[in-house]
Amino acid sequence: MLSTKFTLRSHKSSVTYIYQDPRTPFNLFTADSSGLIINWDLTIRRPKKSWQAHTDTILTISTIHNHLLTHSRDNTIKIWDESYSCILEIPCNALNFSNICVINDLLITPASINSNNLDVYKIDKDWQITRLIFDFDVYKLVNKGEIIEEIGSSGTSRNDFGIIMQMKIIHTNTTTTTSENNSDYIIYVGFESGDIVGLQLILPRARILSTTGNTNDKTLINQSAKFILQYHNSTHVPNPVICLSNLDSVLVSGSTTNKVIIHSDPIEIMKMDHSGIQAIVNFKNDRLIFGYWNGYIQYGDISINQSLPKLGNTEQEKSKLTKKLTFMTILNESNQETLQSPTGKSKYSVLLKSKRNLVSPLLLAGYEDGSILAYNI
């Protein structure tokens, strides 16, 4: 279908991130290339609050310990309290345009001293930070001869994968979970070279040893966290990996070309209608929606784009007037029960919200001109 349902307009710069608050489905955060964040109330489709969170492009919005987390090209990660005052600021490396990943109380980022490598941090509820892994070289791990799977290698030689371009955490039932690591997810890392590497993070539990016969005389031994290689694919080489998504717990990747790879066994290669795959979103776990740099959005046989006011007649002039797509995500349906009056009585505000209840998912697309369009799917 992909028909326009509504438009959100308040950003004056290119939209770079859209995030539905998992704590409150009608609460939406959007960010732009100037570092501005807008908090929307989707029941009235109006901003509730906006603030200058960063001084450069915002690359990631997430939550940790029930608090909002943001990450920017201004080399900072910030955590915000309920009034959106910054309560923790972490310096980070933002030489590339990679996102960061948050899983439980862990933060996975490009390494602070090398954009090719990884750091892992643990953030406690009292906001104490522990660095578990420092400057981890993924390329060296892959080239130890421990490669689980390498597909599509072009045979070209280089001594690194280049900078990290994109990261994605995918929960999976195939990962070996033990009492040592308690891990049921794979961290996929897409690189400038076109390589994609899947890593399992091992977090050994501390061991308690009795150094004497006295049960009260014990020594606590903390073992180091480590990565284990689970997957390597180089089908995209030499084109940088631009986006990572999932299809029913299977990785899906896109690059600067028109090639999309579904990383099943064996892999499936799809040739798309356009090059420059900006975004791939998973709809209901079994369907994919594709967004391209040139502004087109493709869902099955349906392809749409948004045009600016027409000023020219030639094809070249028309292409320049297409809105450039910058971000895309699914807005999940809300729970009707959250909109009921606590007294059980009908109120106008509750009825108004009920009319705008998200009874089905919407596709949210952010554009270079600062607009955000919601599409029926």
Curated annotation (Swiss-Prot):
One Pfam family this sequence matches: WD40
Protein keywords: Chromatin regulator, Nucleus, Repeat, WD repeat
Superkingdom, taxonomy of origin: Eukaryota
An example Gene Ontology biological process: chromatin organization
Signal sequence residues: none
Subcellular location: Nucleus
InterPro entries noted in UniProt: WD40/YVTN_repeat-like_dom_sf, WD40_repeat_dom_sf, WD40_rpt
Spans of repeat WD: 10-50, 53-91, 230-262, 263-303, 342-377
Cellular component aspect of the GO annotation: nucleus
Known function: Component of the ASTRA complex involved in chromatin remodeling.
Assigned protein family: Belongs to the WD repeat ASA1 family.
Summary of subunit composition and partner proteins: Component of the ASTRA chromatin remodeling machinery complex.
Protein name as annotated: ASTRA-associated protein 1
Native source organism of the sequence: Candida albicans (strain WO-1)
